[in-house]
């Protein structure tokens, strides 16, 4: 769905001040879209309004309020970016994740239902490659999803998949696009110049677990935003959005430590670390599969500008 530059196409963005939403809003504006952003914070609303974006202060948990907004705004496209995972926590804290779980489940159900009622022509939602189970084979969009993890990690995966189901089933099943994004890096993320990853590596508190065989598929936030934008015109489907250079944790963790001129990261046997302490971190570092972006390249015509995390990380942490 393209704009002629006359503002004839309108878009509503959730998470418009987030790590993907922020560059997406800038991209939409540069392409002539009329942009409305749903934000929870009044201060963000004032900043957005000053940049030519219509800001609506509200909460996705307020289902009726979101419905009124959609009916009033009647956007052509809904970009649901409030669901993006901008961090890789060492453990999932149920209390801290409660808002995210609410957005993925109740918030998505409400806004998708309202979007359909308002006649939205395309819904694009950001999910995560976290939904893929351990495998030695590269995960494609046809790979069965779900993990056997219990506790909060399992709740997160189930919530993401439930969110995906709402989007994929929207309308007659032909208006929803789900983007399973890789581990985000860049401004505002865990992997940023002043992000938590750098602190942990400098303190030698980001270990390699076991043999470090978990495969990371990274994605720069600007490439993610470009993919979300492209999804506005892509065939309704699920797409993996990752760079072209999947890498084992045994390789990327020391690489970043070297960029930071930090001491070599510790390497812990799994029996010492105790995977039950953090099923997510254990999965990411030891069992996560590589992910293929072939479908997105072919059907969305999307190609990552930063094709390798190596170049992207070197931009963030240039050697001095």
Where are these regions (language model features)?
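N-terminal Rossmann NAD(P)H-binding glycine-rich loop of SDR-like oxidoreductase domains
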Residues: 9-33
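NAD(P)H-binding glycine-rich loop region in Rossmannoid oxidoreductase-like domains
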Residues: 43-106
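Active-site Tyr-X1-5-Lys
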Residues: 149-176
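Substrate-positioning beta->alpha
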Residues: 155-162, 189-196, 209-230, 237
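NAD(P)-dependent short-chain dehydrogenase/reductase
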Residues: 168-215
